[in-house]
Amino acid sequence: MREKLPDFPWDALAPYSEIARQHPDGAIDLSQGTPVDPTPQLIQSALRESSNSPRYPVTAGTKELQEAIRNWAINHLGASGDFDVLPVIGSKELVAWLPTLLQSQKVIYPEIAYPTYLVGALLAQSEPIAVGIAAADWPSADLAWVNTPSNPTGRVHSESELRATISWARQNSATLVCDECYIDFGDSVAPTSLLKYTDGDNSNIL
């Protein structure tokens, strides 16, 4: 297994990091997801208030948390129809373990992408398949990852591109997962969620 895992080319990123640091507004380093900004007081207060909770949290989250996530998805992402919510430690954890949990045989992931999509497929002993953006060119698979806005390119998928991925998923009876962890990082184009374009049918869409 170890010999199949990719080596991440940190050295290859060095010249691009130098270019980014020359930007007038500074660089936003998304290479490791390490927080650099002060923790908001709201979060600090919530952590202090919950520090005397001597039990492990319920995996599914409290009803209050589930309702808050659901309302956020409706109001912020434009989600509609019936859908469930599940809190995770972070999107990277889900990316790494979902192919194993779903027992996926073939996993599609963006050809230019954060390495965890490939690593997750390899850990599950699935067949990883790197693809371009056009879903019409994708082969059949049982799990597909979309990443918008993209890390590392920053590219935002259009409505037609996202709808094409949904059509592909329906045709292949596949699970389609859109990693939108950077959805609030729009610049010249405002990112929109895949959930906005399901027309209320969220089956096999994450």
Which functions belong to the PLM regions below?
Residues R2-G90, W97:
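N-terminal small-domain helix-loop-helix segment of the aminotransferase-like
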Residues E180:
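Walker B catalytic acidic pair
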Residues L176-V177:
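Residue-level marker for buried hydrophobic side chains located in beta-strands
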Residues S53-W168, I183-L206:
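Conserved core of the PLP fold type I
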